């Protein structure tokens, strides 16, 4: 039995002049049914609420202000789920709506609760359909894209694979629409992702660098670090859906780490919202990065923000580059007090234990 998460992008759902959103969803759902009939499990992460809401309200262009985006999402989400429910019900499947914000994954308890609920739903042969709760999410606690959310969902349920359905055939070395020498990238190992992301960021002044590819690379990095294989596939081609369900290597495959960092470290790295920042010295950086040590007070150079025990902080080196995140064992006030009294016996106090410290 396989458990897959499939993310369906807006570019797929909006359809064409010849094909409506409902027809697109019906084609997708019929393909998904063939996968489910083999005894497999499926979770969908779907975009499209804002687009459908705009369509319903006769708004011609995507809104820029948050309140209008939230309003159109509220209207569109009803239509979106109605379409999925109507089509899947006709095919003999039950669905469940799951709306998530960053705040829902911010605590370990809520992350685990979401994980348990999703797992129970698929055990009951229900198809969970996940979307970001755009109606209540503010800018600070907003994913802004379902690529990142789909990776976190895949980690939460220990999925075998994450499928990113989009409107491009592969990841490319350059924007193929502007560069004739662009070549498709068929396979990517986790160790190569950082370089690919950097190259993409260098081209961020063009449409290719600022669009959906950037978030898909982030999604692939999150999932593969946690041990989940990722496949980027052109979902506008009906034949591709058959190919992926037969485990054929189409599109771009992102291979997971051979030794994944695990569910908890993945959550620490990508799901939590940090409330402070700790700068460490070179010795402490070497200790946590190369030796897997805990962060001790003696290695701390500076503290920013106010935090209490078990809150999340960003950990940076002397160049202010993020090197880790973790949950603190000491409040910011007590840590500052220790830093102001370096001669006392508290310099060996653990600030962030290695079990709750995740390298960036």
From Swiss-Prot:
Protein's cellular compartments: Cytoplasm
Enzyme Commission no: 2.7.2.11
Binding residues annotated for ATP, in chain numbering: 7, 166-167, 210-216
Binding positions (substrate): 47, 134, 146
Class of the enzyme per the UniProt entry, highest EC level: transferase
GO cellular component: cytosol
GO molecular function: ATP binding; glutamate 5-kinase activity; RNA binding
Family from the record: Belongs to the glutamate 5-kinase family.
Protein name: Glutamate 5-kinase
Organism lineage: Bacteria, Bacillati, Cyanobacteriota, Cyanophyceae, Synechococcales
Originating gene: proB
């Amino acid at each position: 039995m396989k458990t897959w998460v499939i993310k369906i992008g807006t570019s797929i759902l909006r359809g064409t002049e010849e094909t409506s959103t409902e027809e697109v969803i019906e084609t997708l759902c019929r393909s998904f049914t063939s996968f489910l009939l083999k005894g497999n499990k499926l979770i969908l992460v779907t975009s499209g609420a804002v687009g459908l809401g705009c369509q319903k309200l006769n708004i011609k262009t995507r809104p820029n202000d948050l309140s209008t985006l939230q309003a159109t999402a509220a209207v569109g989400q009803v239509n979106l789920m109605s379409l999925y429910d109507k089509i899947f019900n006709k095919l003999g499947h039950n669905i469940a709506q799951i709306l998530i914000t960053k705040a829902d994954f911010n605590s370990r308890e809520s992350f685990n609760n979401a994980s348990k609920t999703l797992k129970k739903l698929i055990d009951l042969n229900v198809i969970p359909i996940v979307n970001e709760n755009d109606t209540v999410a503010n800018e600070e606690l907003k994913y802004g894209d379902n690529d990142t959310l789909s990776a976190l969902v895949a980690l939460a349920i220990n999925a075998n694979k994450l499928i990113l359905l989009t409107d491009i055939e592969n990841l490319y070395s350059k924007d193929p629409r502007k560069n004739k020498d662009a070549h498709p990238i068929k396979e990517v190992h986790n160790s190569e992702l950082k370089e690919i992301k950097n190259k993409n960021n260098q081209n961020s002044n063009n449409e290719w660098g600022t669009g959906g590819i950037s978030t898909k690379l982030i999604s692939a990095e999150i999932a593969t670090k946690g041990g989940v294989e990722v496949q980027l596939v052109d979902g506008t081609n009906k034949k591709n859906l058959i190919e992926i369900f037969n485990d054929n290597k189409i599109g771009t495959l992102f291979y997971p780490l051979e030794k994944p960092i695990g569910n908890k470290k993945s959550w620490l790295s990508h799901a939590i919202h940090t409330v402070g920042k700790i700068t460490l010295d070179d010795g402490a950086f070497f200790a946590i990065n190369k030796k897997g040590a805990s962060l001790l007070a003696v290695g701390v150079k500076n503290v920013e923000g106010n935090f209490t025990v078990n809150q999340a902080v960003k950990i940076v080196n002397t160049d202010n580059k993020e090197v880790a995140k973790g949950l603190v064992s000491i409040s910011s006030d007590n840590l500052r007090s220790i830093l102001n009294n370096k001669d006392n016996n508290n310099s060996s106090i653990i600030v962030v234990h290695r079990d709750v410290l995740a390298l960036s």
